[in-house]
Amino acid sequence: MAQRYVRIQNQEGQIYYGLLQPSFNVQVLDAPPWLQGQPTDLILTPENYQILAPCAPSKIVAVGKNYADHAAEMGTPVPSEPLIFLKPPTSIIPSETEIKYPPQSQRVDYEGELALIIGDRVSDCTPEIAQTKIWGYTIANDVTARDLQKQDGQWTRAKGFDTFCPLGPWIVRELNPGARLQTFLNDDANPVQSACIDQMVFPPDVLVSYISQVMTLLPGDVVLTGTPEGVSALQLGDRVRVEIEGIGRLENTVATR
């Protein structure tokens, strides 16, 4: 099993990065792992911590319509270059917490995605260099108020509500380029989304390079790589689970705000 890097909070409120062991004990690191954090002698057992989102980025850069089938279901052409937008860090929540349905919207959709974790400051770089700046991978749900997205024209409000970026549950360093991403609702065994991540229009190295030519990415920043076809509405009480082979599962429940 690949090493799983987590971010946790102990009962006293202290926040740590750590390595999740098969026993679910966490070996605490002395710094974020992408900043060369090293293992310490401190071990926390499952009853003594709660898992947080695996990083605390300065920004979340997301990519729209990066799977051709999703662009088609949205009734739009595939972009000729990456379509990027921002989500605020305050939208992040960990796995096993609640997505809050905002009263301003009548249509909130799930969007299961692969997330990249940036490990080093990167600015104006080539795809080859960009690949070396991707420290690891996790799972995201780019929750979207679809009606507000259409109403507003630009996406800040639709994508930016608190709780609209479930992220986690941990980070892995390596990922099979053909890993499958699937999204499930409630107890249905049939996925509502299913695609291999190598079906992206613009792969991760190209995305990071493109973004770096616009804005500097910092260690711990997050890049959301787009969602495949199959997006649809969430209802109050729904449980939405995004799975990526080689990483794990990200699960959240929809609740009233």
What is the predicted role of each segment?
Residues 1-82, 174, 182-184, 188-191, ...:
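N-terminal non-catalytic cap/leader segment that marks the start of a structured domain
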Residues 78-95, 110, 241-245:
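Structural signature of FAD isoalloxazine-binding scaffolds in flavoprotein oxidoreductases
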Residues 46, 50, 70, 101, ...:
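Catalytic-pocket segment enriched in acidic/His residues
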Residues 62, 109-111, 218, 235-236:
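Residue-level recognition of short, solvent-exposed, well-ordered loop/turn junctions
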Residues 123-137:
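N-terminal accessory regions of nucleic-acid-interacting proteins
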Residues 95-115:
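A structural-propensity feature for long, helix-poor, extended segments
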Residues 27-29, 34, 86-99:
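A glycine-rich (often HGG/GG-containing) alpha/beta subdomain
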